[in-house]
Swiss-Prot record:
Its EC number is 5.2.1.8. GO terms for biological process: chaperone-mediated protein folding; detection of light stimulus involved in visual perception; regulation of calcium ion transport. This is FK506-binding protein 59. Residues 32-120, 149-235 form the PPIase FKBP-type domain. PROSITE patterns: FKBP_PPIASE (PS50059), TPR (PS50005), TPR_REGION (PS50293). Gene3D superfamilies: 3.10.50.40, Tetratricopeptide repeat domain (1.25.40.10). The keyword Isomerase applies. One of its GO terms (molecular function) is peptidyl-prolyl cis-trans isomerase activity. Expression in the embryo is limited to three tissues: lymph glands, Garland cells and oenocyte cells. The lineage of its organism: Eukaryota, Metazoa, Ecdysozoa, Arthropoda, Hexapoda.
Length: 439
């Protein structure tokens, strides 16, 4: 039972800690970490009521999330790697007046012997797959975190296998870090950090430099990197719910301009992000307002072009559909959708789009050229189908001939024999019969 120097963790004598063996290093786990430890729990009379050692299996839990008794969260947060300690827990920091029958009686003071085996950082990845792992090195009690669009000031230091490849101060608007080379994993982590906090972030490839790596930093493909990040300061993001329709319209124009600036720099991802913010913040109570409609048409059209530039033709087509829902005779959207349909081999739809452009603009040479291309591709497709049917009939005829019983030779033996020309002719007739000829 504990008898040595005790540390009052709760400040009221409710949680007392006595170190039996000092741990190594200076780091301790923080809220959100997955902690692994061994414990033995006893009543004050020495009666053992539970032990992970008897199960020969470490106990794991998420620290600071209320998954264990209060004393456990408080005590474990102070332990270093390899440390052993006693933790004396008053009832109000354990199981209280109810206890936990039958092993723990009401109003019981408990004594735990703990051994810290290790911990994993907090998983900040969007899909909770461990791809962004944070360990807080220096905590902060300032409850200010960045939100979308807020000004951010930070210091970042990136390393790979112990080699530092970048170390710099950065300032940017949250959500636009890509513009100055901030990888996604760092920006995602910053959203969870308090001003003044320093954290170590382990980031897997999909939120770092991906399958391509980074030649400048000598980062190979699919590499996991590590960043030490300090959030120096941050502003306050836009509170959209407080905005009037006029203010929403003004902010939409700001985002639209940002999108255009990123487009000019060929930063398609950020351009799409800004254009999307533009259309999302537009006022919804003035649907008939021509200025709002004009901005919507422009942003959907610009997003479509960005997706085209990124070779994402399905998304580009969807954005063109949005434009045409607002303006059915929008020539740019029709032409662009025609290009998307042509690329994804929706030839009939592409032809229809380009022909509609010519109806609206009879002198549109670009659309006329695309019509010629569509018709040529449709003709090639038709010929391929004809050959396919011809091959099918030829194979069927050959199979029939192989299985036909021997017959006596006569002068009419050649009559009705299936030739390759017959197969082609039958294929053409079948196509016409099934109404699948494409013109």
């Amino acid at each position: 039972m504990p008898e040595g120097n005790k540390i009052d963790l709760s400040g009221d004598g409710g949680v007392l800690k006595e170190i039996l063996k000092e741990g190594t290093g200076t780091e301790t786990p923080h809220s959100g970490c997955t902690v692994s430890l061994h414990y033995t729990g006893r009543l004050v009379d020495g009666t053992e009521f539970d032990s992970s050692l008897s199960r020969n299996e470490p106990f794991e839990f998420s620290l600071g999330k209320g998954n264990v008794i209060k004393a456990f969260d408080m005590g474990v947060a102070t332990m270093k790697l390899g440390e052993r300690c006693f933790l004396t827990c008053a009832p109000n920091y354990a199981y209280g007046a109810a206890g936990s029958p039958p092993a723990i009686p009401p109003d019981a003071t408990l004594i735990f012997e703990l051994e810290m085996l290790g911990w994993k950082g907090e998983d900040l990845s969007p899909n909770q797959d461990g791809s962004i792992d944070r360990t807080i090195l220096e905590a902060s009690d300032k409850k200010r975190t960045p939100s979308d669009g807020a000004f951010v000031k930070a210091h970042i230091s990136g390393s790979f296998e112990g080699r530092v490849f970048e170390d710099r101060d950065v300032e940017f608007d949250y959500g636009e870090g890509k513009a100055i080379g901030i990888i996604d994993g760092v920006e995602i982590a910053l959203e969870k950090m308090n001003v003044g906090e320093t954290s170590r972030i382990k980031i897997q490839a999909k939120y770092a430099f991906g399958a391509k790596g980074n030649e400048e930093f000598k980062i190979p493909p699919n590499a996991t990197v590590e960043y030490t990040v300090k959030l120096v300061d941050c502003g306050k993001g836009l509170e959209e719910w407080k905005l009037s329709d006029e203010e929403r319209l003004a902010e939409a124009k700001v985002y639209k301009e940002k999108g255009t600036n990123y487009f000019k720099k060929e930063n398609w991802a950020l351009a799409i992000k800004m254009y999307t913010k533009c259309k999302n913040i537009l006022p919804t109570t003035v649907h008939t307002n021509e200025e709002v409609k004009k901005i919507k048409v422009a942003t959907h059209s610009n997003i479509a072009l960005c997706h085209q530039k990124s070779n994402d033709h399905f998304e580009a087509k969807q954005e063109c559909n949005e434009v045409l829902a607002l303006d059915k005779n929008n020539v740019k959207a029709l032409y662009r959708r025609g290009q998307c349909n042509l690329t994804i081999n929706e030839l009939e739809d592409a032809l229809e789009d380009f022909q509609k452009v010519i109806q609206l603009e009879p002198g549109n040479k670009a659309a006329a050229n695309q019509v010629i291309i569509c018709k040529q591709k449709l003709k090639e497709s038709k010929n391929k189908e004809k050959k396919l049917y011809a091959n099918m009939f030829t194979k069927l005829a050959a199979n029939d001939k192989e299985t036909e019983p021997p017959r006596e030779t006569d002068v009419l033996s050649k009559c009705g024999e299936w030739s390759e020309e017959d197969a082609k002719r039958e294929a053409e007739l079948t196509l016409e019969r099934d109404n699948i000829i494409m013109i």
